[in-house]
């Protein structure tokens, strides 16, 4: 069993097919197929179900993937320990929810200070970003917090006011039962706050419409499709233009914190250490 066998196995598991894995790894398909078969023979168990749509992991394959992910992560960290220089460099894979108002400032400041670091950004919802940090797919992520998890450490970024956004100037709480609720998909911190508020009020929304792009969601509110709850900074431009109107909500639900998370047990590169320092500096400025 060689390291590249584990890399091939991981790629096929992630991609769901030999052809996609071969393309990702720049291997010929026959080599990928042969390596997977050799691995199964060596372990004396099938690791994949083969079907017309591709390949999916068996129960033993899922067990194998847990070990493979850990081994390959350890190998990457081992390389990083010896390659990590005093000057931050390399790639930082960072996830973020869409509405972190301080993100452009943080990224700009970091890039100016450490131009040798390549920042790879990926947008997502809080729950999926947490999962990807835990799975070592991301080095860290900006999410709605705070959270509690034994494998995660978090750093304060900002706290923002949440506003109910409507097309009309006035709003009455009973409108939740007559007007569609426009929200991000499950796993969004703003949606969780709004649903908690409605539950406490004993209100059942008329209809829930899910979005995955902030701009589309807000433009839909501006056109009168429904109402939503987002950070004030995210809707400031539309509110200023008079296209939508913002309404305060009870203090208990009216704010949300953004935190930056990373795995506690992941190797702290100089690039990540510098990134955390930049976050801390901007958080301190915002608190003044």
UniProtKB/Swiss-Prot annotation:
Pfam families attached here?
HTH_1, LysR_substrate
What's a single GO MF annotation on this record?
DNA-binding transcription factor activity
Q: Where is the HTH lysR-type domain?
A: 1-58
Claim: Repressor is one of the keywords in the record? no
Q: Which InterPro entries match?
A: LysR_subst-bd, Tscrpt_reg_HTH_LysR, WH-like_DNA-bd_sf, WH_DNA-bd_sf
Q: Any keyword Transcription?
A: yes
Taxonomically, the superkingdom here is: Bacteria
Alphabetically ordered keywords of this record: DNA-binding, Transcription, Transcription regulation
Q: Which residues bind DNA?
A: 18-37
Q: What does the similarity note say?
A: Belongs to the LysR transcriptional regulatory family.
The protein in question is named HTH-type transcriptional regulator CzcR
Organism for this UniProt entry? Bacillus anthracis
The gene it comes from is czcR
